[in-house]
Amino acid sequence: YTKGRMTTDKVENAFGQIPVVKVTYTGKDLPQMEQQFYPIPGKNYFLTEFTLNGESAEVESNLMAPINIDEMPQLLDKGTNRALFIPFDNDKWVRYQSHPLTFDKLTSYEVTAVFNNESRKGFVVGSIEHDNWKTAIEMQSGDTNNLKSLICYGGAADELTRDSKPHGALKGKSIKSPLVLFGLFDDWRTGLEEYADANALIAPPKAWDKAVPCGWNSWGVLQFGLTYPKALEVSDFFKNNLQNNHFCNTDNTVYIGLDSGWNSFSEQELTAFVNRCKANGQIAGVYWTPFTDWGRQAENVLHDAPEYKYKDVYLYANGKPQELDGAYAVDPTHPAIEAQMKKTSELFRRCGFEYVKMDFMTHGAMEADHWYNPEIQTGIQGYNYGMALLNKYFGDMYINLSISPIFPAQYAQSRRIACDAWNKIKDTEYTMNAVSYGWWIDRVYQYNDADHVVLKDATEGENRARITSAVITGLYIAGDDFSEGGSKEGKERATKYLTNEDVNLIANGVSFRPIEGIGTNSENQFMRQDNNTLYYVVFNYGEEEMSVNVPLERIGLNPAETLNAKELWSGAEIDLSKAITIPGKDVKLIRIQ
């Protein structure tokens, strides 16, 4: 570009009336480029985006980078600084990671934080718009103190976005990059929370005026052993043993959820199950995968749209159906998929279900050769189209996403924070890996979900740790087989450990924050401030006993003050001036007042 012109103005948007600095670039045979910078009054961040305008012809691009820093200034204190890897979705047991700046190249999805753990000062870069683009932040390391370069761009498509072809191109007289936030914060954790809040301003979380769901899901143990009689027995077990003994949410409600396998029930059995739940003071839940074909039989006719075969609805890449997790991806914009949504939602509504777990959502966000709707140009556009339809048909139910991208987030009340988790300390550690660096996601959804808590075939310490991982994450969902033929151990452990009143009171749906950001796998210390009460959690993911001193100053407390502390699993009073001991594969959950 040969010419540039800067102007200032004010605009009104979700952030209020804010200043905008526009820089317009022109050049021979080039589309006009206009970059906007929005400094947000009272905040430690600015927003930026740019448009390409074709004067006489359409413009087309599948990569637009509003932030491109080729020589990164030293923004942080010198020291062993870190950069976060945030995954695009939660499939295939993907893990978050805090990296020392010793990598050649690191790509994070939608957002990253780069920070000094000791001072906690850090900067956050990420997309706050998720209508058209999958966004990535690509970083190159200079040395352990600083990055060499950073580029934040719309147009990410690779193995970790589950794509097998390049990102779709936006095409039109005018095309726009994602809107990106760049902020410098005294505490990187606050920075990620403010990033989430900015997202929620633009796309508010799906409304919910009831308490966080607490209950049961059949996939924990029963899986495809789920039957109608067993489902009734589970509902009765909760009524008789748990929900009258502190295992319920603050609405005194328990959710009993049928997962995959419910389709072996007749409609009459489904209705009778829902009615049993209602009689037991419970809400019935169910399960569906809207964007998948598990049969993978291209010539089969769609049951709910018999004028179409499955080959008509696949999302093709390079002429082939796209397979992920054993299922083919289907086109969220195809009328046959809408017909399936309509018929399935009508069935759920006739039966009386009020909660639905939606799974394998990333299939609907894949890049493709084309979509049925010709206006769709990118995978995320297709996903938004499909999710809006999902809300049209299921919007009066509670929607909990399971395997899914983090963004867009406005179509469901909650989302599972990681992949599947069961009963062992490794399941707790894996769940807490996502909470370590993704706790803030409960600001773009109503709640995070730590998956089903299974208690059988694990030590009692592992039980305490796994339950703690749920109550400090969000949704509180048990998973053992509580039918009459189910494990005696699972029932005894549930009656013992799912009924601790002090522990269960913590489960208000607000995720705990990490205290540090340097875990090689997961952080093991977390906290939440509730008015004048501070909760401190320390996990021991290892086999051997460990001792820790509660880091009072790091969690914002004055060691000189008189503090009362109680460990909630044992009920024991804790002397905060002394080290506390955590047995192997266990947890301490401490309330400090």
PLM regions with names:
Residues 301-339, 381, 385-488:
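Glycan-recognition surfaces
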Residues 211-368, 379-382, 389-393, 399:
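Substrate-binding cleft of carbohydrate-active enzyme catalytic domains
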